[in-house]
Regions:
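Catalytic core of non-heme Fe(II) oxygenases with the double-stranded beta-helix
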Residues: 99-174
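Short Gly/Ser/Thr- and Asp/Glu-enriched loop/turn motifs at secondary-structure junctions
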Residues: 92-95
């Protein structure tokens, strides 16, 4: 067998397959300051014995102060649901929610996923350059064995084994719940 390689000046069309995604939008809340204050109280009041090792206490989605936020995230979930071609016979709802700050929380520091959902979202009502990034891990765990760092000139969706997303004020990030992710507070310079 003989392989012939031709050098061409035209660019190939590269089509990703088995796509993963993150969707990003800004959410402006009329009651953002109240949500932030209420969230800080929830963190300090949390009565879960092992708060730091098990994650945060799940919040009541029907809490009146959270209504606008829950409604907007559900709208985002359903827009995403429609855009990726899921059945119009089904709707997405927020089934659980919790609040984190920039402090040490081993539950979000370890790579994890949310196996009970289809989509997950992270909303930052406050953020600054000191916030730790949200890190997503490529589900193709062979990536780092194939593309050694010395081979990569520009990191992109085809050659990266992880992606860091820097939080922005009012930003909401939607992603598939099966996508492994974490927040390394070692990288954080603030508690936002």
């Amino acid at each position: 067998m003989v392989a012939i390689f031709l050098k061409t000046k035209t660019r190939m069309n590269i089509n990703p397959i088995f796509s993963r995604f993150v969707a990003v939008e800004n959410i402006d809340l009329k009651n953002k300051d109240e949500v932030v204050s209420w969230s800080k109280e929830e963190i300090s009041f949390d009565d879960t014995k092992n708060y730091k090792s098990t994650g945060t206490n799940h919040l009541n989605r029907d809490e009146p102060i959270l209504k606008e936020l829950v409604d907007k995230i559900e709208l985002g979930f359903n827009n995403l649901h429609n855009q990726i071609g899921l059945s119009s016979e089904h709707k997405q709802i927020v089934s659980s929610l919790w609040v984190n700050d920039g402090s040490n929380n081993t539950a979000i520091e370890a790579p994890h996923r949310h196996v009970d959902g289809i989509f997950s979202a992270v909303y930052w009502p406050i953020a600054d350059n000191g916030c730790a990034p949200l890190t997503f891990m490529n589900p193709n765990n062979q990536m780092s064995y194939v593309f050694k760092s010395k081979l990569i000139e520009v990191h992109n969706q085809f050659n990266s084994d992880m992606v860091n997303l820097q939080p922005q004020i009012n930003q909401c990030v939607y992603f598939p719940s099966w996508l492994w992710h974490y927040v390394s507070h070692v990288l954080s310079k603030t508690n936002n």
